[in-house]
Amino acid sequence: MKIRKILCLLLLCGLALAGRAADSRPNILLCIADDASWRHFGANGDKVCRTPNFDRVAWEGVNFRHAFCSSPSCTPSRGALLTGQDFWRLEDGANLWSRWPNKFAVYPDLLAKAGYHVGLKGKGWGPGDFKQGGREHNPAGPAYKDFAMFLKTVPPVKPFCFWFGSQDPHRPYERGAGVKSGHRIEEVTVPPFLPDTKAVRSDILDYYFEIERFDRDVGEMLKLLEQTGQLDNTLVVVTSDNGFPFPRGKATCYDAGTRMPLAIRWPPRIKGGRVVDDFVSLTDLAPTFLEAAGLRPLPEMTGRSVLPLLTSGKSGQVEAARDKVFFGRERHANVRAGNVGYPIRAIRTSQFLYLRNFEPNRWPAGDPPLYGDVDEHLSIDGSPSKQAVVEHGDKADVKRLFAFAFAKRPAEELYDLGQDPWQMTNVATESRYTETKAKLHAELDRYMIETKDQRASGKGAEFDRYYYVTGDGAGKPVEAAPRNRAKP
């Protein structure tokens, strides 16, 4: 009898220790917006867009000032985040509307194997087809109706990993929603690459309205975690996949397309109230989540865990080596003959943005007259802002803005951010920047070779031959792919 009691006691102690061990690993909540740029959040300086919940995560945790997506397009950006790899390493997954290559490990699967309860609400990886590779559910996790329903399914001794993929602020918008919500047209600051008209200002407010709705959803999830006593043991991350859906934003490699909001909160390990200036990529999130869960990041991950930055207690530049970031794009939409892409690779530092356009003879926003279409399926989403550029592109004050959005670009672009924060004056051919351009060119070459980018080995045409997934979910050769499809 005594032996039985001792065995039972040991078993109970073991279960308790196992429960504590599981509880000691953080829950992981990723909240990702759909087409939101860095500068349009309160904690990042926007005085009009109301984002109290993003701001809370930033103020109670760490706000990253220089976070960038791997590619300014939904599918490759999300694939890079999930795998912790640069988008150009993902084969088909480097393009929008692609097939998911199941050979690539994703952090939700790795955490599930390590005992995490994993779930997804909303937009995960995509748009594209993950079933052809043999997956039963989205690479971001099994789908749930909402976060509250998911929490009810989490076993008491298991940590969870949840991906909340909002579809805000993706277009189309309800016109006038921003004004109806209480914003005033006069409050808006229009970027200098867009016409400053009433229609554009209202369009920006409609975009703000959807960011605010995303922020409210984040707030509801934080509230649920507080009510269940799980908030402080949850690593909360709020970010976006790519920039805002306006001309010279989404699908471009300028800051409006690539610079992302990123706030991370985890009180037991992260000292709050800090702003970090280190350059980080969304590819860094997967290795960060794995390391926080006590797992070793995979060797093939090109992203680097930001956990050392988070736990350093420091603000400003924490690691001197994190002084640059790399990104780019391939095919975003079916807007060119043969459905070819517009390949770019880029390096961004605190002082400069250097872009290499591999096919400068192609039209960056689509072949004429296709680029001018005002629907929601193109390289530049249809909008009142796009209309303002297209319909008035022959007017003296809009011609330059039209060129920024639609004209062909040279093989190299270089922007001096100290003089030109909006990246509107290309200085690549100016002699005083010759040394700088050569240095950035060499650094980009080195990184592309190091990460086995097909563009560095002369095999870049492969990106144009990958399958293009149509609206019915069927993968078809690029030549057969129709232009119109469901909302990306």
Which residues does each predicted region cover?
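C-terminal helical cap and adjacent loop that interface with cofactors, partners, or active-site loops
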Residues: 418
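A glycine-rich phosphate-binding loop feature that marks nucleotide/adenosyl-phosphate handling sites
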Residues: 460-464
